């Protein structure tokens, strides 16, 4: 659905909700350190290489990406990612850049797959890979172009999840099993909301990375998007469909927060950066997500229902519900209970969702 536009059938949706809701709802500052030596990584040389890459990107008009440039921050992130002292699941790090965090993870004994789309960084990463005995695997690819919605042969750095997981040696496990893979990365500022939506669609439909189980995401995202993910009912601007779906689908944990993550930026970078905070957030899919009436086969319908309900978040609800209750006042679990009630009802069918909307909902806002 396009932002600011009510989806078709909103009036019918309101009548449907009124009938269905009656029985349901009564009741530190990172720094760039050059010259500090780490085993297997020449930080000063990495800094020089990073500066050269940034200059090439500036000349070519390509947006400069953000990387972890501070060894102290890298150690903090490593501690956030490492749970306990026992064996750790494989970790996929996308867009590692100069590899400062990569080296820190390796030093901690974590097995890492580095997925890098910038050819300028591959030689250093591959050199590090060759110096180790299988602890690091380097793959050319772009996580943000994983399983693109196109037909035909993919052109690198676009990558297919099936090929990626085969290369990593990660097999599919049952949904309620332990986490088979952890992923870390910094979400690009451009199209950040769209990328989060794509991940949520994959989660609910058990597609892409989620075909292999409850893959854990550890992402640096903007503080604005984190506030949306953790919003509470009634919060005017923050409580959105993304909020409801993320809170139902995932356990959301704030691991760390930094004021500035990327130091080598354009002179006018502050003109387009939305704020100066990034939040490291862990998104772990819920084990009990697909219990009751919610299943991967009807999850798209559920997503659209939530978007439909919150298209006009101030719409009033009636019928044995408090007078001032509005769509944005319902808790995420209320939406799930409503959907499950509709699924179990012989009165309502999915025809009111409109076939054309179901066909396009995967790509709108993605």
Protein language model features and the residues they cover:
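Catalytic cores of RNA-modifying enzymes
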Residues: 2-304, 337-354, 359-366
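Short, flexible active-site loop motifs that bind/organize anionic cofactors or intermediates
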Residues: 216, 307, 325
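Long, well-ordered amphipathic alpha-helical subdomains in the mid-to-C-terminal portions
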Residues: 297-322
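RNA substrate-recognition surfaces in RNA-acting enzymes
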Residues: 318-340
């Amino acid at each position: 659905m396009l932002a600011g536009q009510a989806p078709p059938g909103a009036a019918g949706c309101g009548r449907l909700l009124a009938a269905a809701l009656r029985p349901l709802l009564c009741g530190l500052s990172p720094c760039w350190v050059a010259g500090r030596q780490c085993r297997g990584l020449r930080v000063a040389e990495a800094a020089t290489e990073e500066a050269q890459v940034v200059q090439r990107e500036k000349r070519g008009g390509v947006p400069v990406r953000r990387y972890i440039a501070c060894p102290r921050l890298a150690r903090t992130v490593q501690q956030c990612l490492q749970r306990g002292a026992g064996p750790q699941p494989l970790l996929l790090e996308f867009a590692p850049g100069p590899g400062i965090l990569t080296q820190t993870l390796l030093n901690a004994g974590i097995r890492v797959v580095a997925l890098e789309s910038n050819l300028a960084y591959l030689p250093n990463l591959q050199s590090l890979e060759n110096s180790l005995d299988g602890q690091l695997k380097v793959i050319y690819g772009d996580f943000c172009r994983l399983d693109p919605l196109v037909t035909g042969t993919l052109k690198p750095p676009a990558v297919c999840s099936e090929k990626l997981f085969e290369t990593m040696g990660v097999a599919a496990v049952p949904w309620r099993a332990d986490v088979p893979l952890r992923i870390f990365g910094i979400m690009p500022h451009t199209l950040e909301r769209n990328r989060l939506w794509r991940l949520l669609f994959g989660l609910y439909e058990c597609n892409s990375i989620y075909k292999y189980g409850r893959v854990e995401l550890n992402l640096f995202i903007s503080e604005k998007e984190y506030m949306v993910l953790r919003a509470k009912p009634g919060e005017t601007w923050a409580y959105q469909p993304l909020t409801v779906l993320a809170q139902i689908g995932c356990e959301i944990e704030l691991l760390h927060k930094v004021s500035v993550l990327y130091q080598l930026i354009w002179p006018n970078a502050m003109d387009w950066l939305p704020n100066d905070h990034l939040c490291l957030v862990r998104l772990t899919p819920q084990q009990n997500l697909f219990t009751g009436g919610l299943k991967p086969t009807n999850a798209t319908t559920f997503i659209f229902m939530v978007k439909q309900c919150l298209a006009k978040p101030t719409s009033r609800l009636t019928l044995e519900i408090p007078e001032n209750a509005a769509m944005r006042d319902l808790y995420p679990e209320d939406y799930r209970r409503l959907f499950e009630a509709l699924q179990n009802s012989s009165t309502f069918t999915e025809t009111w969702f409109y076939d054309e909307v179901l066909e396009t909902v995967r790509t709108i806002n993605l």
